[in-house]
Amino acid sequence: MNKKELKDRLIKEKVSRALYSLDGGLPNEKLCLDHENGCWVVYYSERGIKTGMVSFPTEDEACEYIYDQINAIVIGKVK
């Protein structure tokens, strides 16, 4: 899946935008997706610091990973 498909899927599933940013940057307390130096990265941003950064060679892999991470958070909150 690409970034647009991911965004559409999260909107369709009514996932709160408070959980994530698909535009990178350093928003506070969000999972983030970004494209840096030719690779895709997923990280958690808190207080201007990127933590738990994971790099992927493809957009598809990064989008699947962040979707799974967001889904785990949502399911965890429901339980």
Annotate each PLM feature:
Residues 1-5, 27, 33, 41, ...:
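Structured catalytic/translocation cores of nucleotide/phosphate-coupled proteins
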Residues 1-25:
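Negatively charged, low-complexity tracts enriched in Asp/Glu with abundant Ser/Thr
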Residues 18, 41-42, 63-65:
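Intrinsically disordered, low-complexity segments enriched in small/polar residues
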Residues 20, 72-79:
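Intrinsically disordered, low-complexity charged/polar segments
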Residues 24-51, 69:
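Short aromatic-glycine-(Arg/Gly/Cys) micro-motifs in beta-strand/loop hairpins
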Residues 52-56:
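A short, polar/proline- and glycine-enriched secondary-structure boundary/capping micro-motif
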Residues 57-73:
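A short, charged, amphipathic alpha-helix used as a generic interaction element across diverse proteins
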